[in-house]
Amino acid sequence: MNRPPQDVEFKAGKAKLTGTTVTSDSRKGYLKFGVTPEGLTCVQWRPRDSSAYEDEFYFAPGESKFIKVPACKTGRMYYLNFSGSDQKEFYWLQEANVEGDAKIEKALKVIESYIPDDDDDEEMVVDTPPPTTTIKQEPPKNPTINEVSLSQPKPTTTPPPSATNLDFIKDLFSNLPTQPKQPQITLGKILTAENLIPFLRENPEIKKDLIQYLPEEYQKDENMINEVLHSAQFLQSIETLDYAIHEGHGPEIVSLLGYEPSIASQRGVEGFLTNIQEGTNKKKNNK
């Protein structure tokens, strides 16, 4: 029997094509490729904070194609091609380690080229489903070094719980006190294009200072900074900075920005921004 390949899931965001411009969705998500018991290729996307899939597409065996956008400077923008139509669904990779992109492409090629045997329909009814290959981000040793690995969950032989045990567990958890989950503050929710563009419009001096850090071809047009704020490269940079702060590198980043690190910079994004604000106020008072 031609056994179906493992499912592949990795961090990826959505993007939208408008005319000839691809605009990235700032949300973080997961993109999953797999093969159904019927032999169809299934592609699903969901936000990381939800278990519900927003996108779900099915392809006949051998017809799914996940193609890299050659015009993208970072090389991390892809589109899902639909043969026989002009439809294209765009996604951009959000894994921190760019070098791991090749592993993702290789794993997807296996799924794209999978063609089930004619007798697979009968055997798949009693066959066990393939495990999922999750391409996940391991904690880096420093904010610039990341690792991406393919992990395969081990099969379990634990027998299913009885109905009596399930009822007991439900009763146990129903009596436990619940605590409201505090939303995590991230730079991605603060430094959005929707927030930054009006701010820069009202602060032209800051905008002028930032333009000098753009590529030379962008510096001639001040409005090009708006395009940068919507780009996948900018969103990826914000996500990497977020990760470094949450991994405890806030004091180092504060120091690189020319401010004196405080204990607050070790307390996530909120503490990091508080440290920056305090440093800015201190410099103003010393003038």
Swiss-Prot record:
GO cellular component term of the entry, any: proteasome complex
Compositionally biased region (Polar residues): 143-152
Chief localization: cytoplasm
Pfam family, one: Rpn13_ADRM1_Pru
UniProt keyword terms in alphabetical order: Cytoplasm, Nucleus, Phosphoprotein, Proteasome
Family: Belongs to the ADRM1 family.
Protein name: Proteasomal ubiquitin receptor ADRM1 homolog
Organism: Dictyostelium discoideum (Social amoeba)
Source lineage: Eukaryota, Amoebozoa, Evosea, Eumycetozoa, Dictyostelia
